Swiss-Prot record:
Residues at which Fe cation binds: H47, E53, H91
Catalyzed reaction equations: 3-hydroxyanthranilate + O2 = (2Z,4Z)-2-amino-3-carboxymuconate 6-semialdehyde
This protein's UniProt keywords: Cytoplasm, Dioxygenase, Iron, Metal-binding, Oxidoreductase, Pyridine nucleotide biosynthesis
Protein name in the entry: 3-hydroxyanthranilate 3,4-dioxygenase
Cofactors required: Fe(2+)
Keyword Ion transport attached: no
EC number of this enzyme: 1.13.11.6
Encoding gene (name): haao
Residues involved in O2 binding: R43
Binding-site list for substrate: E53, R95, E105
Source organism per UniProt: Xenopus laevis (African clawed frog)
Amino acid sequence: MAMAINVKKWIEENTEYFLPPVCNKLMHNQQLKVMFVGGPNQRKDYHIEEGEELFYQVEGDMCLKIVENGKHKDVHIKQGEMFLLPGRIPHSPQRYADTVGLVFERRRLDTEKDGLRFYVEGSPEVLFEQWFYCEDLGTQLAPIMKEFFSSKQYKSGKPDPDQPKAKMPFCLSTEQVMEPFSFQHWLNKHRLEIIQKKCVSLFGDDHETKAVIYGGGESKQSKAQTDVWIWQLEGTSHVTLGNEVLKLGSGDSLLVPEETLFSWTREDGSIALSTSQVPLPM
């Protein structure tokens, strides 16, 4: 049974999970993974996945360390800012105390692999890496980290010449990442356009992340091909799932499961974020 969740209240009720050693809590863990992450959490490992990740800083700032075209780079995401990370870019989130960030990623396709990588200190040279099919990153990381900390590479800080280089299942992205932007400033700038067009995309159609701002209006019944997460930012709306009608007030959210028929009616003055991730054909 679908249920509306007030985001602010949910964060307050789950504060304990945003502290070490856990530092995160999944609100939804289906086709779309909707998670909130806290800190402090400083790390050396870099994660690589084929899909995109969408970041939004709810409270406080964070630093996302990435390797862009062979060069280390820090992406600073401030409170209230949004950032879309392309797939196939090594990244390492650095989070601080008293911060909370919202992160979206999707369930992996059967053909996809994730990588966990460490670099030689201050260098783009790979020190250690492993590739695996990601089902539950939280539990799968521990044995890989344990193997790394007992390895020659960790003890010497240099690659092991006797260790064959891992074969990468795909090439890294050569895309240059975007600059983080203030979500509220974006809303203010596009408010008239949202009212006139009824909906405006944040990132366009050439990304697998479909993040769309909806104003007042109606979305007729259709089937969600993937999970759709709705966050009612202003005003009210009503989502119909079968015979069930759910009212969303300001701050409420709702996950519409994949393959579900639904319709959505938004009152005048409504502003809502709809987020889904549809894997792009390779």
